From Swiss-Prot:
It is found in: Plastid, Chloroplast thylakoid membrane. This is NAD(P)H-quinone oxidoreductase subunit 5, chloroplastic. The lineage of its organism: Eukaryota, Viridiplantae, Streptophyta, Embryophyta, Tracheophyta. It holds the Pfam family Proton_antipo_N. GO terms for molecular function: NADH dehydrogenase (ubiquinone) activity; quinone binding. NDH shuttles electrons from NAD(P)H:plastoquinone, via FMN and iron-sulfur (Fe-S) centers, to quinones in the photosynthetic chain and possibly in a chloroplast respiratory chain. The immediate electron acceptor for the enzyme in this species is believed to be plastoquinone. Couples the redox reaction to proton translocation, and thus conserves the redox energy in a proton gradient. InterPro entries: NADH_UbQ_OxRdtase_chlpt_su5_C (IPR002128), NADHpl_OxRdtase_5_subgr (IPR018393), ND/Mrp_TM (IPR001750), NU5C-like (IPR003945), Proton_antipo_N (IPR001516). It comes from Ranunculus macranthus.
Length: 738
């Protein structure tokens, strides 16, 4: 089946007819194109399904042991320089192809219903298809120049989708923030590519892997410059994957439609940075210090993301910080050299996070009928609660995604996260301790999100009552403690405050908009029984529930592909290792070594205990009023007033303020970095206008007045000109003689 590999070059081009056809249709036949808009959604799903089948065949060939395949077209510019374009198929490529296509198909089916009321429906599907095409081109690229081209296209599509509702100021600002932040990473990536080309004379992966290794082994090149170039490449990945300190764009990217948030966080933009590090992994492993830098950035990011998610009120922002933290785990694994564990967690996290984001979209969709179209209200967990009664199917899927991300067996993320935690103990006890602590924080904030959304009562109907205030530790509740906001130049530092300023008046959905709403192109009847009301939240349509059902299946079973074999030989689901054999033979000579039952159970028991402890704390702090956790004598003992209680309140308040204000990092950038750049720009403008132009204009003005003076003195007579000429000559001679 060699032709399967030879035809792989067409993969990025298969989705392209959709945006082209939509663009031409809107230009030439706008009315007809809008009337048949469901057809475009159908073909978007169909073409991506073809790529998925193609990807599955390629993956099966890789698992069966087929070698890495590369096909290149060379464009010779002159005798000394040529550009090569082609496709590169290896296990990493096949993994990314399956992730992009499977998650992309579910998001497209979901989006048909979610975006059906939106006037930008066609524009959305055009962007989405081009986004998928760009990401597919990125993962099949055979050299760094090709990667950079598709890297920029992926970034462009993400900016368009983040700012999809560009008439909203927050969305426009978020789009600009993502653009500027990623410009830093993209420029660094470009410099790193040029530096590597200057060193190796090639853009091909295999060429500069071998050349760089030979140069280092033979001390044939400046190791500092090579380290600098690889560090610049890594900065590009840091920005794209929202790693510290270039993570600030990710929470604001939630201003885009929820389906695109699911795609960005699961399989496209943020995965692009991880893909770049994984693709260049052979280069990073032979460069001194760079692996330590990758691990350090990963450990900082996973802890920072977890702490910033602790007190967020917006359900999508909470999930965004969760993504940031989980990508930190993947980056940590790559920095430790755990290539297999990193890709394993990339796979499991993608499906779990797609499930959570699409579940949050179902929640937001149902809340909009109660609070109106307002992201500040429909995405605010303070106004939710008790949704189990109204959206039981969404609740079940969201709970399974939450448990998976918490690391509860046998769900997907348990297997991959547990492997990363085990490897971290071998790398650094300090890093391992932080990673385990963050695992507990992950369980806490994820279950906090679930409890605030689905348990208790619908808070919008009882705004002045919160069951959490009955808790002794109400100071970190969603409603907060009496306080104030300090507003400084459009940026505010929020302290613990009550939520009385929230207005419950909402815009009502336009009747004409509802009557003209298009039905989804896929109708799934008699699977789920949904009852809609317009005074309470309701369960989503079957077209939105079907992707949740499919992703639940992935969340249940995808983890089994990476279970390592045991000594007893009772489990043999080591599909992932067989899949990755061509890529990791040179990295882990002993990767086939298996764990015994005892070691596995001890490690699993430890990680699961941490997760359950975080869940217990979340139940204690955010459980509903009828929760039996509030009646424990032990808890009553801890919440008694006293000096220790006051100190504990202060600690909790500081943690809350740190988390809710995003660690003050955005404020630091706004007050120091952005203000400093603007101040420098103002000074440069002043210096240019007042000093530089002042000197130039001053010389002109002085020359003008001198000329005018001489003109009137001379009077136009030749005798006067001769007199002044002789006078100047005499002065010149006197000066010279002296």
């Amino acid at each position: 089946m060699e032709h399967i590999y030879q035809d792989a070059w067409i993969i990025p081009f298969i989705p392209l007819p959709i945006p082209i056809a939509i663009g031409l249709g809107l230009l030439l036949f706008p009315t007809t194109t809008k009337r048949i808009r469901r057809i475009w959604a159908f073909f978007s799903v169909l073409l991506l399904s073809i790529i998925m089948i193609f990807s599955v065949i390629l993956s099966i060939k890789q698992i069966d042991g087929n070698p890495i395949y590369q096909y290149v077209w060379s464009w010779t510019i002159n005798n000394d320089f040529s550009l090569d374009f082609g496709n590169f198929i290896d296990p990493l490529t096949s993994i990314m192809l399956i992730l992009i296509t499977t998650v992309g198909i579910m998001v497209l089916i979901y989006s048909d219903n979610y975006m059906s009321h939106d006037q930008g429906y066609l524009r959305f599907f055009a962007y989405m298809s081009f986004f998928n095409a760009s990401m597919l081109g990125l993962v099949t690229s055979s050299n760094l120049i090709q990667i950079y081209i598709f890297w920029e296209l992926v970034g462009m599509c993400s900016y368009l989708l983040i700012g999809f509702w560009f008439t909203r100021p927050l969305a426009a600002n978020a789009c600009q923030k993502a653009f500027v932040t990623n410009r830093v990473g993209d420029f660094s990536l470009f410099l790193g590519i040029l530096g590597l080309y200057w060193i190796t004379g090639s853009f091909e992966f295999r060429d500069f892997f071998e050349i760089a290794k030979n140069l280092i082994d033979n001390n044939g090149y400046n190791s500092f410059f090579l380290t600098l170039c690889t560090s610049l490449l890594f900065v590009g990945a840091v920005a794209k994957s929202a790693q510290f300190p270039l993570h600030v764009w990710l929470p604001d990217a939630m201003e885009g439609p929820t389906p695109i948030s699911a795609l960005i966080h699961a399989a496209t933009m943020v995965a692009a940075g991880i893909f770049l590090v994984a693709r260049l992994f052979p280069l990073f492993t032979v460069i001194p210090y760079i692996m330590n830098i990758i691990a350090l950035v990963g450990i900082i990011t996973l802890l920072l993301g977890a702490t910033l998610a602790l007190a967020q009120r917006d359900i999508k922002r909470s999930l965004a910080y969760s993504t940031m933290s989980q990508l930190g785990y993947i980056m940590l694994a790559l920095g430790m050299g755990s290539y297999r564990a990193a890709l394993f967690h990339l796979i499991t996290h993608a499906y779990s996070k797609a499930l959570l984001f699409l579940g949050s979209g179902s929640i937001i969709h149902s809340m909009e009928n109660v609070v109106g179209y307002s992201p500040d209200k429909s995405q605010n967990m303070a106004l939710m609660g008790g949704l189990t009664k109204y959206a039981p199917i969404t609740k079940t899927s969201f709970l399974l995604g939450t448990l998976s991300l918490c690391g509860i067996p046998p769900l997907a993320c348990f297997w991959s996260k547990d492997e990363i935690l085990n490897d971290s103990w071998l790398y650094s006890p300090i890093f391992a301790t932080i990673a385990c602590l963050t695992a507990g924080l992950t369980a806490f904030y994820m279950f906090r999100m679930y409890l605030l959304t689905f348990e208790g009562h619908l808070n919008i109907n009882c705004k002045n009552y919160s069951a959490k205030k009955n808790n002794g530790l109400y100071s970190i509740s969603i409603w907060g403690k009496m306080g104030s906001k300090v507003i400084q130049n459009n940026y505010f530092v929020s302290t613990m405050n009550n939520y009385e300023k929230i207005t419950l008046k909402a815009k009502q959905i336009d009747d004409n908009g509802i009557s003209n709403m298009m039905r989804p192109f896929i109708t799934i009847n008699k699977i789920f029984d949904n009852t809609k009301t317009f005074t309470y939240p309701y369960e989503s349509d079957n077209t939105m529930l079907f992707p949740l059902f499919v992703l639940v299946i992935f969340t249940f079973f995808i983890g089994y592909i990476g279970i390592l074999p045991f000594d007893q030989g009772r489990i043999h689901f080591d599909i992932l290792s067989k899949w990755l054999i061509p890529s990791i033979n040179f990295l882990h000579s002993d990767f086939n070594n298996s764990f015994d039952w005892y070691e596995f159970l001890i490690n699993a028991l430890f990680s699961v205990s941490i997760a359950y402890f975080g869940i217990f704390i979340a139940l204690f702090l955010y459980g509903p009023a009828y929760s039996y956790f509030h009646n424990f004598n032990l808890i009553n003992f801890f919440i008694k007033r006293g000096p220790h209680r006051i100190l504990w309140d202060k600690i909790i308040n500081r943690v809350y303020n740190w988390s809710y204000n995003r660690g003050y990092i955005d404020i630091f950038y706004a007050k120091i970095l952005i203000a400093g750049i603007r101040g420098l720009a103002d000074f440069t403008y002043f210096f240019d206008k007042k000093v530089i132009e002042g000197i130039v204009n001053g010389i002109g003005v002085i020359s003008f007045f001198v000329a005018e003076s001489i003109k009137y003195v001379g009077g136009g007579r030749i005798s006067s000109y001769l007199f002044f000429y002789l006078f100047y000559v005499a002065v010149f001679l006197v000066i010279c003689l002296n």
